[in-house]
């Protein structure tokens, strides 16, 4: 089971899925709410917004219970979770520790890069914006999808992979996610605080890499 990252989608994982398939793994992947072909919750098609970070965990459990588990046929279940999906995956492992035998948390979102703004300031501002009813505003420096390529500031060193996915984004509006809301940031901070609590970490039974 794959849990993708912030502003990503299942479409971005085609190459990895093929690699897993070639090694005899069946693969299931969810588009997290607000991402890919899942419903939008932001002010436009590009914005990632969520009312409660725990909704991601509930969605994943529903996906597992309704789609994945009924097709397991006594096979073991493994998790590959990246970035934001890593935080979702870690919280899931803490709350529901009887699903996965093993898990890979790839660059999990255990902290948030707040850029030029100190983390404490970002926490205060995001909470303030939510309190005064402006939680659905874009984060500073975030905005609607830009149709001009920006490989230099992307999260990959592979130009070929960047161009491949960017071209898909241009062709498919549902892939054009590009920024978060203050609601999302505020909830992400809460989710990270929860997953890093020692008593919650102790609940994990799966082998984790």
Describe each region flagged by the PLM.
Residues 5-8, 84:
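Active-site glycine-rich loops that stabilize anionic/oxyanionic intermediates
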Residues 10-12, 17-43:
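Conserved alpha/beta-hydrolase
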Residues 48-69:
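Alpha/beta-hydrolase active-site loop
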Residues 71-83:
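Alpha/beta-hydrolase fold nucleophile elbow
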Residues 88-176:
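Alpha/beta-hydrolase-fold enzymes
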Residues 177-209:
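Conserved serine/cysteine hydrolase catalytic core
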